[in-house]
Amino acid sequence: MLLAVDIGNTSTALGLFSGEELIAHFRIHTDRMRMESEYRVILKNLFALEDLPPPKAALLASVVPPVEREMKRAIERLFGVEARVVEAADTGLEVLIDNPREAGADRLVNAVGALAYPSPTGRYIVVDFGTATTFDLVEAPNRYLGGAIAIGPQTAADALAQRTAKLPRIDLTPPKAAVGKNTLEALRSGLVLGYAALVEGMVRRFKEEAGEALVIATGGFAETLRPLCPCFDVVDEDLTLKGLLRIHLGRG
């Protein structure tokens, strides 16, 4: 029984695996001010709510060190197991960038998760929608080749609302048409359709440089963009958690 934890800048995903089956999945807000005792209460309540058995192991991927520290302590005190934090060496990947230490743990874990999918060319492009959206190029059997970082769609929407006087916050749902007839539809067109165009354009450029690849989308916005991005071959919102499982099982 593995508890896999993906600590992102905005939200934290937790998955409980029995063998290779994901039997429970939770998402909570990432709060840098929460203490270990608070995370312990949250975890205890989540497990009690679903009547879940305690994990026998825990593995964390994190881009937020203060939360990582408190979450690790909470898991270890509540469940009495070691909570390991993934390092680049744990992934089994050959990280072929200028400074391998700069590669985010979540991106490397995504690469491990992607390698579970069969790719006719042995290459993968992973698109992960979060606070930032990342594009990563991976090559079988274990090569991480680099990528790109763009602003996340919700981050862009929030920034626009904060820095303009008359533009409201909106939910990121696809508009009826590209040509908006009111402010809300115009915003949705620019933010959703514009973002889809960004994704399609980046994937096209990656393929022009590296050749054909299996495109895997993950993160909370992936399902919204699925009908707008024909470049997606796979949408897997649990890719990071599955990558953590593969590392735990020694398949990284």
Curated annotation (Swiss-Prot):
Superkingdom, taxonomy of origin: Bacteria
Cofactor list: NH4(+); K(+)
InterPro entries the UniProt entry points to: ATPase_NBD, Type_III_PanK
Compartments, record wording: Cytoplasm
GO cellular component, one term: cytoplasm
Role of this protein: Catalyzes the phosphorylation of pantothenate (Pan), the first step in CoA biosynthesis.
Protein name: Type III pantothenate kinase
